[in-house]
Curated annotation (Swiss-Prot):
It comes from the Bacteria. InterPro entries: DinI-like_sf, DNA_damage-inducible_DinI-like. This is DinI-like protein Z3305/ECs2939 in prophage CP-933V. Keywords: DNA damage, DNA repair. It comes from Escherichia coli O157:H7. Gene3D superfamilies: DinI-like (3.30.910.10).
Length: 82
């Protein structure tokens, strides 16, 4: 499965150093518990977005990734060490 998370450039510039890499690592760890062969890409773009590809169950996978992203973002104080 390939997960591509697009974060608006103006938001990325406000994130602490290392936050993008830490987010990628944490999402990979969490999503890998349910799906094998996960590739997570976090990149700066003009708009926020999420795409999930290379999986047979796209709808349920995207729902799972959206929930996981939300939980991960909301619990950043627990896993992100500056």
């Amino acid at each position: 499965m390939r997960v591509e998370i697009c974060i608006a450039k103006e938001k990325i510039t406000k994130m602490p150093n290392g936050a993008v890499d830490a987010l990628k690592e944490e999402l990979t760890r969490r999503i890998s518990k349910r799906y094998d062969d996960v590739e997570v890409i976090v990149k700066a773009t003009s708009n926020d977005g999420l795409s999930v590809t290379r999986t047979a169950d796209k709808d349920s996978a995207k729902t799972f990734v959206q929930e996981t992203l939300k939980d991960t973002w909301e619990s950043a104080d627990e896993w992100f060490v500056r």
